[in-house]
Amino acid sequence: MAKLDDLIQQKQQRDEDWKAKKTAEREELGQLSDDAVMHVTSEPGAYLHYLDTQAINPRYSASNVMLAMAQNPDITYINSLEVWNRLGRSVNRDENGMKIRVSDTYMKDGREYHGYKIGRVFDISQTHGKAGVPALSLKDNTPEMDAALRRLLDSSPVPVVTSSTMYQDAVYDPKTQSITVSSRLIDSKIFAALSREIVHAGIHDHGRYPYYTREDCAMDAESVSYMLCRNFGVEAPQPDVSRVGQVFDGMEVQDRRGVVDSLQKYFRKLQNDIQREISPQERKQPEQNRPAR
C-alpha cells in the first residue's frame, strides 16, 4: 500500500503543479492583454496599426487582436490551426503562434459556467499551402457595391436622404435624427461617408445618449468606417487619431478595453451583414476569406 500511497501523492503533486502553471499562465496573459490595451489606446501609431489589423480579422475580438499584436507586431491575417487546415494550409514546423483567450463553457456541480481557456492563433506568414481565397474588393458601379450600399441603408438607425447642394460628403443631424448624403459622390465615397455617419447615428441612439457631440464621437465613427472600408477594399482616408491619448486619458484599462471592443462589434456587425448580402451562400458555410475565432 505504501507504493500506492506514493503514487497517489505524486499524482496530487502533479495536479497541483499543473494548476499552478495554468494560473500563472493566465495571469501572465492577463497582464500582457492589459499592457496591450494601454499601448494601443495611448499611442496614435499603435491605434492605427490596430485598426489595420482588426480590419483584416473581423471575427476576432478587439482584445484578442491586441493580444496577438503584442506577441507579434507584424501579424496580418490570423487563424487557429483548425481553420488553417480547413483552408488547405499547414502551420510551419516549430511555430508556436500567439496565445489568445477562447470562450469556454464548462459544468461544475450540475451548473453551467462560462469562462475562457487559452488558445493559439497563427499568422499566415507562419503557414504554407494553398493560396487563400482573395478578399472581396468592392468596386464602383457593380452589383456587389449596389448590394453593399443597400445593406448599409438597411442598417441605418435613422432615415437617409440626399442633397445636391451640400458641401460635405455626408452628415448626421442629431436635431432631425437623419443622415444627408451628397448626391455628387461616387459609390466608394458614399460607402465610406455613409458608414461613418451611421455610426454617429448609432452612438446618438435616437437621443438616448444625451452627451453626444460630433467632435467627441468623430474618432470612433471614423475608426469603424475605416475598418469597414479596409475590409472591403474601399479607399478611405485614415481617421484622425492624433488625440487618441487624450480621448482615453484617465480611463481604467477595463473601460478602455470596453470602448475598443464596442467599436469592433459595431464594425463586425456591419461587415457581416454586408458580406452576407453580397455572398448569400455564406449563410450556409463558414467564411473562407475571413479569419474565424
For the regions a language model picked out, list residue spans one by one.
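N-terminal accessory/interface modules of nucleic-acid-binding and processing proteins
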Residues: 1-293
